[in-house]
């Protein structure tokens, strides 16, 4: 899938002859020389942020079989221009939606075992650095990994993954002092500061996963492990699973261990739940973004790059039957 991403703000995308021109608008603070882009072989033009595009430019891209994705400044897609008739993007969506159940189950097993492996790795890291005895929790997560490989249905797989996640959060809770009130995972609403940070961080991961999938030419909706219902973006949730521990959970541990927030930075509204204060939220969001955009140990890439790689892998696994190899967290 040949895709081009335009980010920032204020660019004007126009048709000039048989090519597209991309230039800064009249009100832009910085003038840049115009750039040209050929529509030949272009499968997807992704436009993120506030820009303008002419109908002639839309017609030029779509007449060559390409699609245009419109995204907000955070990378959330909100619309597409698609060519009439067949196109590479439409065919890829159809192949994704019609993936056989056996293939989906195989991919789902890989997603679960990869996610459980990354949970085990973070627990082992906490045990080594903090001196906790997490042997029981690690063993339970490993048992869940072994059982996941034998599951013959998505329902049984979800049950096994749930038991492994429960054991993981029992061990993970030891990383926090009693003042944080964290006893395990809770959401909708989060009941304590740690859960509030986890949920907010996972939301940031969804944005990364969604953008990576759209740029790779895959629909966020047709997944393998999670169900598609009520407009839930199943493939986004699938892709996020293996990144929760290495990106968000690890950041939460470091963020609170460095005293970058206190319990007073969180509020408890009358309607229930726990909310992050404005200043703490800014600091925490910056910490998560630093993690996402920083180089990953043992990899010559950032997590943002790895998201793109894994999006292409999971998409090919669904549409072409390739083996899905999840990201393995190493410390």
From Swiss-Prot:
Keyword annotations from UniProtKB, A to Z = Antiviral defense, DNA-binding, Endonuclease, Hydrolase, Magnesium, Manganese, Metal-binding, Nuclease
- What biological-process GO terms show up in the record? defense response to virus; maintenance of CRISPR repeat elements
Please name the CDD domains in this protein's record: Cas1_I-II-III
What is the name of the protein in this document?
CRISPR-associated endonuclease Cas1 1
Sites binding Mn(2+) sit at 161, 226, 241
Cofactor(s), by name: Mg(2+); Mn(2+)
Species whose genome carries this gene? Methanospirillum hungatei JF-1 (strain ATCC 27890 / DSM 864 / NBRC 100397 / JF-1)
On subunit structure and binding partners, the annotation says: Homodimer, forms a heterotetramer with a Cas2 homodimer.
Q: Which residues form a coiled coil?
A: none
UniProt enzyme class? hydrolase
Instruction: List its EC numbers.
Output: 3.1.-.-
Q: Quick check: keyword rRNA processing in the entry?
A: no
What molecular function terms (GO) are annotated for this protein?
DNA binding; endonuclease activity; metal ion binding
Its family remark reads: Belongs to the CRISPR-associated endonuclease Cas1 family.
Record function comment: CRISPR (clustered regularly interspaced short palindromic repeat), is an adaptive immune system that provides protection against mobile genetic elements (viruses, transposable elements and conjugative plasmids). CRISPR clusters contain spacers, sequences complementary to antecedent mobile elements, and target invading nucleic acids. CRISPR clusters are transcribed and processed into CRISPR RNA (crRNA). Acts as a dsDNA endonuclease. Involved in the integration of spacer DNA into the CRISPR cassette.
**Any keyword Metal-binding?**
yes
